[in-house]
Design a protein with these regions (language model features):
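Short, active-site-adjacent cap segments at secondary-structure transitions
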Residues: 45-46, 96-99, 137-138
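Short, surface-exposed acidic-centric catalytic microdomains
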Residues: 21-62
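Divalent-metal-activated hydrolytic enzyme cores
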Residues: 43, 52-81, 111-152
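Short beta-strand segments
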Residues: 6-7, 39, 90-94
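Extreme N-terminal starter segment of soluble prokaryotic enzymes
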Residues: 1-4
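Short amphipathic alpha-helices and their capping/turn segments at secondary-structure boundaries
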Residues: 22-36, 74-89
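Short N-terminal binding/cap micro-motifs at the start of the first secondary-structure element
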Residues: 11-18
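N-terminal glycine-rich phosphate/adenylate-binding segment common to multiple enzyme folds
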Residues: 78-107
Length: 152
């Protein structure tokens, strides 16, 4: 089984802040599976660290208002072009690229709204089952993830 995973969840320091979101339970789930680590921001050539972005009115923007949409969508497109066939994607919740169910609202106030990040949306459109780390670990089956729990 091939699983595409947000690289920050694996402990790679690729977050906008320069840190990571290493998640031991995600790592345990991935044991025995082929892992395809991705960071769309890094794929797009953005530095680590980098200014934070949010999605405002469907566009990826920095706090200073600079539109970053094209570069973030380029990163998502590069992930799709190189990923090959994957059976499942586990992405970082809340991220403007990887958020599956919620994203920050574009005001940089910490408020979340329902929505998907640009990579999550592209994967869903490509027919890839997508979950975030919270959904994977909660036992909920909103995207049929339990069917993947025991697959090698």
């Amino acid at each position: 089984m091939r699983v595409l995973v947000s690289a920050c969840l694996l402990g790679r320091n690729c977050k906008y802040s320069g840190g990571n979101n290493r998640n031991e339970k995600v790592l345990a789930f991935l044991q025995g599976k082929e892992v395809v680590p991705v960071c769309p921001e890094v794929e797009a050539g953005l530095p680590v660290p980098r200014p934070p972005v949010e999605i405002r009115k469907g566009r990826v923007v920095r706090k200073d208002g600079r539109d970053m949409d094209d570069i973030y969508r380029l990163g998502a497109a590069r992930v799709l072009s190189r990923m090959g066939k994957v059976d499942l994607a586990i992405l970082k919740s809340g991220s403007p690229t990887c958020g599956v169910h919620d994203i920050y609202d574009g005001t940089f106030s910490g408020k979340k709204i329902k929505g998907r990040g640009v990579l999550a949306e592209a994967l869903v459109r490509a027919g890839v089952p997508v979950v975030d780390e919270k959904e994977l670990l909660s036992g909920r089956d909103a995207e049929g993830v339990t069917a993947f729990r025991d697959k090698p």
